[in-house]
Amino acid sequence: MTILTHTLGFPRVGLRRELKKAQESYWAGNATREELLAVGRELRARHWQQQKQAGIDLLPVGDFAWYDHVLTTSLLLGNVPARHQNNDGSVDIDTLFRIGRGRAPTGEPAAAAEMTKWFNTNYHYMVPEFSKGQQFRLTWTQLLEEVDEALALGHKIKPVLLGPVTYLWLGKVKGEPFDRLTLLKDILPVYQHVLAELAKRGIEWVQIDEPALVLELPQAWLDAFKLAYDALAGQVKLLLTTYFEGVTPNLNTIIALPVQGLHVDLIHGKDDVSELHQRLPADWLLSAGLINGRNVWRADLPEKYAQINDIVGKRALWVSSSCSLLHSPIDLSVETRLDAEVKSWFAFALQKCGELALLRDALNSGDTAAVTEWSAPIQARRHSTRVHNVGVEKRLAAITAQDSQRENPYEVRAEAQRARFKLPAWPTTTIGSFPQTTEIRGLRLDFKKGNLDANHYRTGIAEHIRQAIIEQERLGLDVLVHGEAERNDMVEYFGEHLDGFVFTQNGWVQSYGSRCVKPPVVIGDISRPAPITVEWAKYAQSLTDKPVKGMLTGPVTILCWSFPREDVTRETIAKQIALALRDEVADLEAAGIGIIQIDEPALREGLPLRRSDWDAYLAWGVEAFRINAAAAKDETQIHTHMCYCEFNDIMDSIAALDADVITIETSRSDMELLESFEAFDYPNEIGPGVYDIHSPNVPSVEWIEALLKKAAQRIPAQRLWVNPDCGLKTRGWPETRAALANMVKAAHNLRQAE
């Protein structure tokens, strides 16, 4: 039985972020719909050809998405919220963008769908909305059109579909409460229709993604898989695809399904290959996810060979990435500035395809010479002085419980802070960043390219900071920020100033919609050679009598939004970062900065997928934050910010952070996230976000007042702050001014009403 290679998906954005640029040009009215669609066709054709040339036997089709693949599935099923629907019920690409960006067909503002993290990754999806009695029908044929494209190009393909049970699991009920699982029988006919259309096209295998099968699911949801796949069986061969964890706990459910193959993630799961082989039906294909789709490290191919070789020839076998390569940059070969030694440690999406081909050839032939040669740099790295820093390791080993304790409890600190800052009721602030204008980005780019000397660069950044302070004082905000003009990304900026990180030129990965990030890579022990934020924070504070927040990205977020080392634990990395940033807190405080924000938007996303594994993660995640913050004196107010979060199940840990103020993203959920804080009786101060910064819509004063009044029904008004949902980096100045003016006005109105 010959082993084949396949991938579960490939990066969509293009090596030069062509998709992002085309989307934003279209949204700005500078490109036609056909021009946008042409970019998509070009990218798909290029990516299929690149994978094929790299050695992939069966190409994924349907992994491309204009915004995210869950939203694509919603359109496929005709699941369009009423506020975004065309009058005639038709669906087009503008419908998709309206759901993601918040517009009605008339062009008027309409709340965007809620956005949240895709399992425990830094990718996002638009949450499907379900209502009682909802109808579904095939309305969006993107998958079928792309299958036709790939077949016309002569490729051997494997269409990709998000499975029906996972799709329902990822959604939320809107309106009258009901069990959304009851909709399964209503969406299955659409899936049957799609599979029938694929069968007509001669498709043999369909990859149907059910990552919910790695979770600890209620029994009713486990039972739903049998109902679903009994209905879907028979038209094509189904490769039931899981990832991000192992399947062994739910294997009894899986082996009862009428599918023809199973993909398992052998990187992030603890499944034993021999046990899987013994328990799976003998005629099933096993797709082994042996190459990490979520990191950038070169694979130890001899180890992968040994992991799978015992079952070669005993059952049908494919080798694949652990998950979609969506989470990896595209091509290492264009990284011309990386040090040669460090570069030899990495593999991006195309190189991972090559690794799969090497592994396939070795398994088919029994000749391991090529895989051994490929993995030689891994052995060298284990002894590199660039990886190990004895001073950092000693400091980490010396941590005591006292290092994670503030001097006094919140009640004592709050009194000292009130006396120091004398803020009004309903204090107003922003989350940190202001619009990153073309001028700001150009300034940074010119400096990075060497076209601008340091003095001119610093003068330019100082002027943008000065303007940000002027804007905030003009608006009447109470606690100011410097605007972060010097920062391209909240994680990359800190990584650039910490030892132990390296950066790529083109290592972009998609976060959501058109937003891409370029995560740093943790290659060694982490330390802070010099202060990072102090100079600009001190300068901003010198321009105003109002408090200016120092802005730090927290240790867990830096960890989660970087590509981490794989030779030490995530806990070790987080605590190394915490110690480095603890010194930054002390330096900011010494420079006269009285309010310091330590952003931890990724705390929840780092949770293991199985609840039984949560406690250990939360214990070290909270400890890392507290180590970072505990250098602050009582009168220094520590803020933290979180977004895209469901807090109900981690409230103990949120409280254990012991931040003086937490700001959270709540506007898209209509303040429902505050229910968690109310039920828990959260003791510290809270800033519930009052408008959605991911949408260009400007909220009215009345809208903001209504949200704040709703918040005050759950949290005492004296402990409430007023702020946007998130940073304003991606917005333009006109809507930023308008939105903040309305926010400040709403706060003033509420003060006057008291």
Curated annotation (Swiss-Prot):
Binding of 5-methyltetrahydropteroyltri-L-glutamate, residues: 17-20, 117, 515-516, 561, 605
Required cofactor names: Zn(2+)
Cofactor note: Binds 1 zinc ion per subunit.
InterPro entries from the UniProt entry: Cbl-indep_Met_Synth_N, Cobalamin-indep_Met_synthase, Met_Synth_C/arc, UROD/MetE-like_sf
Gene3D superfamilies: 3.20.20.210
Pfam families: Meth_synt_1, Meth_synt_2
List of residues binding L-homocysteine: 431-433, 484, 599
Class of this enzyme: transferase
Pathway named in the protein's UniProt entry: Amino-acid biosynthesis; L-methionine biosynthesis via de novo pathway; L-methionine from L-homocysteine (MetE route): step 1/1
Catalyses which reaction(s): 5-methyltetrahydropteroyltri-L-glutamate + L-homocysteine = tetrahydropteroyltri-L-glutamate + L-methionine
Catalytic-site annotation from UniProt: 694 (proton donor)
Entry's EC annotation: 2.1.1.14
Example of a GO biological process term: methylation
Coiled-coil stretches noted in the UniProt entry, renumbered to this chain: none
Full protein name: 5-methyltetrahydropteroyltriglutamate--homocysteine methyltransferase
Gene designation per UniProt: metE
